[in-house]
């Protein structure tokens, strides 16, 4: 491929990258985490700060930006999900600039972006109204500016570190994992570039000073609730299996759980084959900047995973999460793509090409089918209201599940307010009737099944229900009549609601 065509390739793959994220962006309703985001952003500025302080586990920047975003374009599902899509697309810029600093050919950079365009792990969080793509944008920008700081350039050393300081301030206000990136940058200098340590120490001091207001604000709420255990207790400590699955996810096979161990085995064999080919052609790998680039990228990829894994094992509560390290997708893809073009081994070229083609076809087919990781809770609410359309009285909804009440309550409150926030299911034309129906539903949170009483009510539960008998069977044994249920599913769970009539 000529250099002229290589340069035109990048705008094309960027367009595909953006289109893949816009496509079906509003096909499924918001989940509980996204609902929390828009709920926080709906507060006044003071109320937003209090809500984020009470939550404590995420800094406030994303919520500020989401509030401004909604003020500009409204709260429709499509518009709100455009914000993480925008952050994800902007993250291409620092990664391309970093690739150019590594003197990678345009075809290598374009291929990296092309693979990222259809990467399922990255696609999912690019359509998820949370702060993870903002963290990715900040982390990748930090890596690019950090690399520029330790390389000769036209700007002065002081000005480059000043820019890095500003970027890192934004980064730590986007997510606490921003501190992980900063820490790895410091250790990189200790290992390889100690002459820049003084500048970096000053930069870190300024970042810390800028973060003190949030430490004080969140610290008040953390102290009042006795720590962060209530926020983090649901996160399991990672084991070797979780670590292996993270790399399966990072490689782009996480959306295909049916592959299971075969994916891990296949990836291990591919790594071994690539390693053998690299050893055979080690002279070519040492040509140019490949070894330097590989060291830089691998350090941040493996360092991020190692620190997160170790901290999660040692701390009282785990901080492990694939979503927190979505920023590693681009560096990993750049490293693999650069190695692919650097090696001339026919075995690696053919194997890599076949694997990439099979993977791409599976990913595109999966994306065209739609997201199966989120539950269509809005459908539950609409169907419940449809069945209660002729009932003029109030009805209680008992959630015997710990989490189901939250989305049901949110979508009812949204309809009561005459809004469409988070809805993907088509709504009936008579919005006033819909709002009146929603106002008649009273939601009870996480109750015991024995507390579900009345002449007529609804019950909701999920596939996490622990009892031997289903809620329908328990209520039927009590002498009540359970109506036909409404069930919705995602890849991992199902949620069910059903009406009940009991003799008074």
Where are these predicted regions, by residue range?
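Membrane-proximal helix-loop-helix interfaces that form the catalytic/acceptor-binding platform
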Residues: 5-153, 157-503
């Amino acid at each position: 491929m000529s250099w002229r065509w290589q340069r035109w390739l990048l705008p094309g793959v960027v367009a595909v990258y953006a289109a893949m994220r816009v496509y079906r962006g509003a096909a499924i309703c918001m989940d509980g985490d996204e609902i929390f985001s828009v709920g926080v952003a709906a507060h006044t500025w003071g109320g937003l700060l209090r809500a984020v302080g009470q939550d404590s586990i995420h800094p406030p920047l994303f919520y500020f930006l989401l509030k401004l975003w909604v003020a500009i374009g409204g709260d429709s599902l499509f518009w709100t999900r455009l914000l993480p899509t925008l952050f994800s697309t902007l993250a291409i810029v620092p990664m391309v600039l970093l690739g150019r600093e590594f003197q990678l050919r345009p075809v290598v950079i374009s291929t990296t972006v092309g693979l990222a365009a259809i990467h399922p792990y990255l696609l999912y969080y690019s359509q998820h109204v949370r702060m993870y793509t903002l963290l990715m944008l900040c982390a990748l920008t930090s890596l690019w500016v950090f690399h520029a700081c330790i390389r000769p350039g036209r700007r002065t050393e002081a000005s480059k570190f000043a820019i890095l300081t500003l970027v890192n301030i934004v980064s730590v206000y986007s997510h606490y994992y921003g501190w992980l990136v900063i820490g790895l940058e410091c250790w990189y200098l200790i290992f390889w570039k100690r002459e820049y340590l003084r500048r970096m120490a000053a930069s870190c001091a300024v970042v810390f000073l800028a973060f003190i207001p949030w430490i004080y604000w969140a610290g008040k709420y953390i102290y009042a609730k006795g720590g962060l255990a209530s926020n983090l207790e649901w996160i399991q400590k990672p084991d070797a299996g979780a670590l292996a699955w993270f790399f399966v996810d990072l490689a782009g096979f996480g959306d295909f759980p049916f592959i299971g161990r075969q994916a891990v085995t296949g990836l291990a064999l591919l790594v071994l084959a690539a390693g053998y080919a690299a050893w055979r052609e080690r002279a070519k790998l040492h040509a140019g900047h490949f070894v330097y680039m590989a060291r830089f990228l691998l350090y941040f990829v493996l360092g991020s995973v190692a620190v997160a894994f170790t901290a999660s094992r040692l701390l009282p509560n785990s901080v492990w999460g694939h979503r927190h390290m979505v920023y590693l997708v681009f560096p990993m893809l750049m490293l693999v793509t650069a190695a692919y073009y650097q090696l001339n081994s026919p075995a690696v070229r053919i194997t890599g090409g076949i694997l990439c083609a099979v993977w791409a076809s599976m990913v595109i087919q999966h994306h065209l089918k739609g997201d199966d990781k989120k539950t269509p809770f809005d459908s539950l609410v609409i169907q419940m209201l449809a069945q209660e359309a002729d009932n003029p009285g109030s009805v209680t909804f008992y959630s015997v599940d710990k989490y189901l009440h939250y989305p049901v309550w949110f979508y009812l409150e949204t309809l009561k307010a005459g809004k469409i926030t988070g809805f993907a299911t088509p709504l009936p034309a008579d919005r006033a009737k819909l709002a009146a129906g929603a106002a008649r539903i009273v939601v009870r949170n996480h109750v015991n099944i024995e507390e579900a009483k009345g002449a007529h009510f609804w019950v909701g539960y999920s596939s996490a229900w622990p009892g031997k008998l289903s809620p329908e069977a328990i209520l039927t044994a009590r002498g009540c009549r359970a109506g036909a249920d409404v069930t919705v599913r995602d890849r991992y769970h199902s949620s069910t609601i059903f009406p009940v009539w009991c003799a008074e």
